[in-house]
Amino acid sequence: MMTDFKKMDILSLIKDSFFYGLSKLIPGLFGLISVIFFFRWVGAEEYGQYSIIFSFTNLIAAFSFGWLNQSILRYGSSFSSENKIVYPLIIGSVYGVSFIISILAIGSYFYFPTKFPLTTTILLAGSISVFNQIKTRFQSNESPKNVVLITSLQSFLMFAFAFFTTRWMGANAVSLLLGLAFGYLIPSIFCIKRIHLGQIWTDKNKLMVKKFFNYGAPLSLWFGIQLSLNFSDRFFIEQFYGPQLMGSFAGFSEFIIRVFSIIIFPVTLAIHPKVMNQWNRNQNTHETFRHILNGGLLQIVIFSGVLVLALVFKHHIFNAILSLVPGIDMEMETLLIPLLIGGFLWQFGLIVHKPLEVAEKTKKMVLCILGALAINIIGNYFFLPKYGLIVTAYTMIASGTFYILSTVMFSPSFWGRIHSK
């Protein structure tokens, strides 16, 4: 029988998830609208080109700046003044930008993953990186209103600038990418404060950057590999079936992902501070597990309702999506249910891996996500040409299942301490 205390925990989680959902509503809706209109403006083939270039650029930005963002969340509150953390961040940002320019220049030279405009992609990657760093600093300072404000503004400006650039430069992938770059850059410029700069390249600041890197690099690697899963799907589909079909897949899958970000992801956002704060207070595995269990159960309940509706009204749902995003290949209807299941498994995995995350077992998290990426690559490379796009959807399910099971297996001490309570 559930105690009143546990009921209060679940009610608190539902309440927090609801408010996180509201905070995600405006960016989520603009993201959903962007998928619809971007696809309409440029068509399936150009949208496919845009999608794979953006996925690659976002991936490089995550590898270049993710370690800094994770360090801000971990160490930001330990600095007595803003200037003291700014100096190491400036040094780290110089390294990050240098890495972005180098990797994108190499990719552009070898036409990997496809031919793309180097200057535009450098601007986009840099803008994404700066924007995410500013957003992370707001999160570290516990300023949720500023996070909502800047993400909402970014979502609106991204859409608005993309509208103008496609009218000015023509309806193509490059104009969309340039519009997105300005959408990330403009709100970042307004948020940058004027500070008094002293000696930046001191030994103390360099040591702090080294500390940031040692802590954040494994997490940055994890985020980068996670983004590689989406990039891998698009890369192999384009290689075997061309940009037209890849564009249809990208538009359809991103539509579903945007819906998930509004419905399911708020639970993940709500559970994260509860788990971290509980662990930081007393490292009580039993109480931490209760929060993880509540979050997982709430996600399962929400997804079960979504899945039942999708199974009953599958054809009607696909027709509704088709009316919003015309030009999507009819084959996408067979992917609806597998993509929903795969999307849920990865959201569920973000909660299941919390024991490793709170215990700072980031190397084990990286091993798990590498295994999932290997399944993705092997499945797409060997079976996609023979069986079609349904393989990509099923590799998403297989990789998500592997990640969940492997993270559980890597947490025996945590689960053992739970059962010993």
Where are these regions (language model features)?
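Interfacial segments at transmembrane-helix termini and the short loops linking adjacent helices
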Residues: A44, S108-T121, V312-F344, I390
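Transmembrane helix-bundle signature of multi-pass secondary active exporters and lipid flippases
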Residues: F54-A62, Q226, F249-L269, P273, ...
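Membrane-water interface segments that mark the loop-to-transmembrane alpha-helix transition
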Residues: K15-P27, I53, N58-F116, R281-L307
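Helix-loop junctions and terminal segments of transmembrane helices
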Residues: S64-S80, F252, I256-Q283, P355-V358
